[in-house]
Swiss-Prot record:
This is Small ribosomal subunit protein eS17. PROSITE patterns: RIBOSOMAL_S17E (PS00712). The keyword Ribosomal protein applies. One of its GO terms (cellular component) is cytosol. It comes from Methanothermobacter thermautotrophicus (strain ATCC 29096 / DSM 1053 / JCM 10044 / NBRC 100330 / Delta H) (Methanobacterium thermoautotrophicum).
Length: 62
């Protein structure tokens, strides 16, 4: 069983991948810093959810 993410997290993550192609990697810590830099996410919890989802998408693309 996996984690279910809200449509907000999915939408923001996909938009960030499209607007910044090639910047995100399959490393969570790197993506966490990039999400903080590129977005105006207000909470650490939400930032980590978005970074984790981006990491998962990038890992599946490889």
């Amino acid at each position: 069983m996996g984690n279910i993410r809200t449509s907000f997290v999915k939408r923001i993550a996909k938009e960030m991948i499209e607007t910044h192609p090639g910047k995100f990697t399959d490393d969570f810590d790197t993506n966490k810093k990039l999400v903080e830099e590129f977005s105006t996410v207000s909470t650490k919890h939400l930032r980590n959810k978005i970074a984790g989802y981006i990491t998962r998408i990038i890992s599946q693309q490889k």
